[in-house]
């Protein structure tokens, strides 16, 4: 694709799923760069079931658990595990995931809640950040904050 990574997708605005600032961020940035370099599918892209841009984001999240990313249920491809694996830690690093080529799977994590993946579509519940997760609709529940300090800090620094 020749599109910019943060460009609109069918006129939808991209949104921030993690914003970390303050002391400790430089180390996280280095880990993100290393994770991006270790992505096993740099020259492959399949919209469904993956690998795609959401597979890449999930890979970086798994490699950098400090991000604690809870990828949106509409992120088709997030459940496509690297190199044919069927078990992995969840993208947030706070749970576990079982997935068969991103087509069928289960995930349970502190950040994500419990998710069922059928044909790349996510159905789930998040009891700790109350929401129901549905394909196309996304998260149904109170809005969550997208700002999470890397380490408690009195003054924000540059964004990641």
Residue ranges and their predicted role:
Residues 66-85:
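Catalytic cysteine-centered active-site loop
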Residues 21, 53, 71-74:
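Intrinsic-disorder/low-complexity, polar/charged segments
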Residues 47-57:
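Amphipathic, coiled-coil-like alpha-helical scaffolding segments used for oligomerization/assembly
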Residues 54, 83, 99-101:
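Sparse, context-dependent recognition of short Cys/His-centered cofactor- or disulfide-binding micro-motifs
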Residues 52-53, 76-78, 105:
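Solvent-exposed loop/turn segments at secondary-structure junctions
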Residues 1-49, 62-64, 88-160:
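Non-catalytic ligand/cofactor/substrate-binding and regulatory segments of enzyme domains
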